[in-house]
Amino acid sequence: MSYQNLDGKVRVRAGLSTTYSVLAIAIASATSMSAVAAPAAKNETTVMETVVVTGSVIGNSDIEDVKEYPGARTVITRDQIEKTAAGSIDNALQRVPGIKVQDESGTGVLPNISVRGLKASRSGHAQFLMDGVPLTLAPYGHTGQSIFPATLSMLDRIDIVRGGAAVQYGPNNVGGVINLVTKPIPYTWQTEISNRLTVFDGGDAPLNDFYLRTGGWLSDTFALQLEGNFLKGESFREHSDTDVKNFQAKAQWLLSDTQEIQAFLQRYDAETQMPGALSPQDYEQDRHQSKRPYDDYEGKSTRWSVKYIHDLPFADSAELEVLTFGHKSERLFKWGFNSAGGHWADPALPATDVRTSPREFTVYGIEPKMAMYFGEGKSVTQNWIVGTRYVNEDIDYKLTQTPIAGGATKVPRDWHLDTDAFAGYVSNEIGLFNDTLKVTPGLRVESVRMTFTDRGKKQTADNKVTEWLPGLTVAYNVTDQWVTYANAQKSLRAPQIAYIRGLGEEGSELAWNYEVGARYTQDATSFNAALYRIDFEDQLQWQSSTQTFDNIGKTLHQGLELSARYVPEVLPALSLGASYNYLDATLEEEGANKGNQLPYTSKHQLGWDATYAFYGMDTTLSGFYFSDSYTDNANTSAEDATGATGKVPSYMVWNFNLGTDLYKDDKGKLRMNVAVNNLFDEEYYFRGIDTSPVGRYPAPGRSYTLDLNYQF
């Protein structure tokens, strides 16, 4: 189990790797809380952590899990989120090498996240988990995050695993895994209240983010935590009213010394107006205005999961875990549609119709797995992970069109997709030379059966996909500080309901992922370098003009990621961080566009931050840079009159944050952060975003934030 104290740091963690008695946790909690107010005593009680069996290749998504991990990986802590002035999940990811974000709202409600050049729209090529449970609407048939039921205030950290996890975490793992880790239940009952107020230059009303959490252990065997997050207001543009409510409850129940149940329940409701893109002329006139008055969004989701953990008395150590999860979700996009000529989404033309896309999702899954450790104290060790998963998805997929001038509503699409997906996986981490060298072969098999029904045409078609997905990771501890690693894994993205379009014959998108790199870790100083390559077969690409998908064939994504953190021994109050990504993402299919850059991919990405602590205050200057990118496969440089094609210019954004504890003792603390995002008011934009794909989509300008957080 995990718990945290008033400083927000996880003191003892358990779960798949180890089990602690409640007495030991109480001792650790008391020790760490007294340490806030007093020096360490001579006779301290120390809780030793012994990791014997590991049931997850990514562990608990802690900083400690990164050091020897056999792939490129970044963990963003709550402290880093605060100091870099991140106001949303997508904003927190901006400085991670290989991640690019199209921030269409400034509120984080509908993030568009690209990993290593994969398409960003609705984060459909990024596999998101929350506490290890799939977050996406449908892991197989609809990977696009057109509901993103997560808010930054409820997170403790974010784990971005770019390589090495495909065997256990699939499908849709071409770009790796992003695990959102919620705040753990504290051992001593704790309440947290925070309010974050953001004012945008040019905005009409502020955006307010209120968060409340209370929880702890009610007895030696039962813990409970309740959370609520309310986001309300506007961003920097007209037609951007936002109202989000996010409620979570989690519980832990120790059935015995060897058995535990963890439960999670969430209700998420979001409504937001979508200001849409602007024509180049309107953008130059006033980038804060909106020309898409009919564009709106609503999303609702009820999610749950129950996990049973049982330590077993065989091998040197063994553990059984059974995870069940599910959700019932609804979402509705509404947007203006022009059917009178020109591009349907041209923001300079008036809409003739209003389209809606109501969709409903019912998902259920169960995943039992076993972890077994052999060879304790020997020169050769083995950590086996064997698991299987069943997921059922029921998707209703509609499209309606209503003339603004009046008339009957048409239903161009009325589809249904029922999916039964079975997966099995096995891996064995073999430790050689006293775990100096770790080699992990693994295999995942996916068997997906889809039944597609076009209710309007009264047609039904079946589609079955079976794929064997091998993987191999290697990590070598050169010294206590240096680790070299390499991995190769085959990844899958199952056929999507929007791709099938009634044919029932579309195949999967497949890719081979390769990485080789090295990592240095010494106290707070670290460095990582990774070369990566993704060989993608049969990549499908959305064409907004025809609203169909094209198979663009083979694509190649390759590059170099660098990241470093330096804390000088002579000046520990200073912390310097930097990252760089070089990405060459190209079309490889024979034809006129072979060798061209994939749309929306920047070759160069930089991230940086510098924090200096003095007189009880932390000051941080941070930022990111992305080079220019193209909009189409032909790599057209000149912008056309509508803004549908043309280069997207490079941009550089600076942020500033000042944080200090206004009050702190062993019973509680009150912390204040003052931030300025986009310090120099860089004006930049994106293209090609979902329901408004034509024109320039403005990114947020300068904003000012006051954040107060009280824990007691």
Q: Where are these predicted regions, by residue range?
A:
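Short acidic/polar hinge/loop motifs at secondary-structure boundaries
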Residues: 133-162
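Face-selective signature of the C-terminal outer-membrane beta-barrel domain
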Residues: 254, 260-261, 266, 297-455
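Extracytoplasmic beta-strand/coil segments of soluble accessory domains associated
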Residues: 70, 90-137
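C-terminal beta-signal and adjacent terminal beta-strands/loops
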Residues: 628-634, 660-712
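Transmembrane beta-barrel wall of Gram-negative outer-membrane proteins
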Residues: 204-274, 296-309
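Membrane-embedded beta-barrel scaffold of Gram-negative outer-membrane proteins
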Residues: 307-337, 477, 483-489, 508-569, ...
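Short strand-turn segments of transmembrane beta-barrel domains in outer membranes
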Residues: 165, 182-216, 228, 235-237, ...
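Gram-negative outer-membrane beta-barrel transporters
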Residues: 370-373, 433, 439, 533-535, ...
